[in-house]
Amino acid sequence: MPTNRTSVSSGSDFEAAVGYSRAVRVGPHVAVAGTTGAGPAGDIAAQARDALRRIEIALQQAGAALTDVVRTRLYVTDISRWREVAEVHAQAFGQIRPVATMVEVSALIAPELLVEIEADAYVEP
């Protein structure tokens, strides 16, 4: 394992059960795992907003910020609702404008989850 590797935990039981970290930083690169969010039942925008809030916390714990994000991947269970998620993404990233991919998936780990987001960041050395 690289000596300049930092792992970030959110404390989720899933991390130990699955064997992953919320985020990992190696040198200037930070990868944040697929992150879901909470919100009122069926509110995909609220879930996206909360997922991005959790991603921001993980980035901060790894010594990065939303302004360092260069790529996001968004997984939604209903692509017809893409605009709701896109609006939240645009609000969070403003002029940062990382490259992004959004795809529809058949399901996430729990049936009430509607969106999951990954982020990659690069921190200037």
Where in this protein do the model-derived segments appear?
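Short, polar/acidic, helix-capping and beta-turn segments at strand->helix junctions
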Residues: 1-125
